[in-house]
């Protein structure tokens, strides 16, 4: 099986909390479900299991689930 490329998760603020990102990107239906996924050690951030649901994610962070791979990126402003 080949490794899939990470898709971009654009944020419009300096950071986003992990549980909110999982909900926003439709990897969890609710905050409760996001918390369960995190508590079950099913989420990795930057290659390590993450157990903090409110972990702050910044541009450049990578999130991996069994369903998807995400790269957190900052919104690009047009000049």
Label each PLM-derived region with a short phrase:
Residues 7-8, 59-79:
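A positively charged, amphipathic N-terminal helix/segment that binds anionic biomolecules
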Residues 2-16:
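A detector for short, charged/polar N-terminal pre-domain segments
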Residues 13-59:
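A basic, amphipathic helix-loop patch mediating RNA/tRNA/ribosome contacts
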């Amino acid at each position: 099986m080949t490794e899939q490329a990470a898709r971009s998760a654009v944020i419009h603020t300096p950071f986003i909390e992990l549980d909110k990102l999982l909900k926003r990107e439709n990897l969890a239906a609710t905050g409760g479900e996001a918390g369960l996924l995190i508590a079950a050690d099913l989420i990795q951030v930057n290659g390590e299991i993450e157990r903090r649901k409110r972990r702050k994610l910044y541009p450049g962070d990578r999130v991996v689930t069994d369903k998807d791979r995400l790269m957190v990126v900052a919104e690009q402003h047009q000049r």
